[in-house]
């Protein structure tokens, strides 16, 4: 089953992720537990029909680029273009939609994006680029927001996503790239988000940044030119 209108990179990402997820070995046991080697999460015998994988599709959605697995391994959260999804993956190889919440860029931001000569067909949208587990009840998400990065907390209820409140959306500069094609990285450690991305509209100011948590915001100084202008995260 083919995904509708998905770019090759996004299509391949989901396929590779599910394939690797089912074959990924569990962590080695702690010392003193017999010294057994890594054990596979799932075992299949040759010829077993359950080895086949199904591909998820949802009409009107594309660019399933950002993935987050829940702690219990039963839910896969997916950041797409202008939406965040929760997929049930309890049945190996058969992802099913649990629920989905829209998070589009505002019409004002889309208009500003197009005015700055960006494409209103391929670029002026909110591409979800950061999706991390903040605590047991919230995810933290950031997106390009039509070349005006934004972030928000997403509340969870029984692993389902609750709607995003407009007044809870924050500036995401330094956490998400402006341009969806720019490389980026983000990891949450002890309640603090460490991110690396481009910090301006032109994509010429790379930055490393620490946000969230109780510590003050910390970031690299662009004037020191410690990072090369073409840095890739």
Which role fits each region the language model picked out?
Residues 2, 6-7, 11-233:
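Disulfide-stabilized extracellular ectodomains of secreted/luminal proteins, especially beta-rich
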């Amino acid at each position: 089953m083919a995904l509708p209108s998905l770019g090759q990179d996004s299509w391949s990402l989901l396929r590779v992720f599910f394939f690797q997820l089912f074959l990924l070995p569990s962590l080695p046991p702690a010392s003193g537990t017999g010294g057994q080697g890594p054990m596979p999460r799932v075992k299949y015998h040759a010829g077993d029909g359950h080895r086949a994988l199904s591909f998820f599709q949802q009409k009107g959605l594309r660019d399933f680029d950002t993935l987050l697995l829940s702690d219990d391994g039963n839910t896969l959260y997916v950041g797409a273009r202008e939406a965040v999804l929760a997929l049930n993956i309890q049945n190996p190889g058969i992802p099913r939609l649990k629920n989905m919440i829209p998070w589009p860029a505002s019409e004002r931001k889309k208009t500003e994006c197009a005015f700055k000569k960006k494409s209103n067909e391929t670029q002026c949208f909110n591409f979800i680029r950061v999706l991390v587990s903040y605590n047991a009840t919230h995810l933290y998400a950031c997106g390009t927001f039509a070349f005006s990065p934004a972030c928000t907390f997403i509340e969870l209820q029984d692993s389902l996503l609750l709607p995003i409140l407009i007044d809870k959306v924050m500036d995401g500069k330094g956490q998400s790239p402006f341009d969806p094609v720019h490389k980026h990285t983000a990891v949450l450690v002890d309640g603090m988000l460490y991110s690396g991305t481009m910090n301006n509209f032109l994509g010429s100011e790379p930055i490393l940044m620490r946000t969230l948590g109780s510590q003050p915001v910390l970031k690299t100084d662009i004037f020191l030119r410690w990072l090369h202008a073409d840095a890739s995260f």
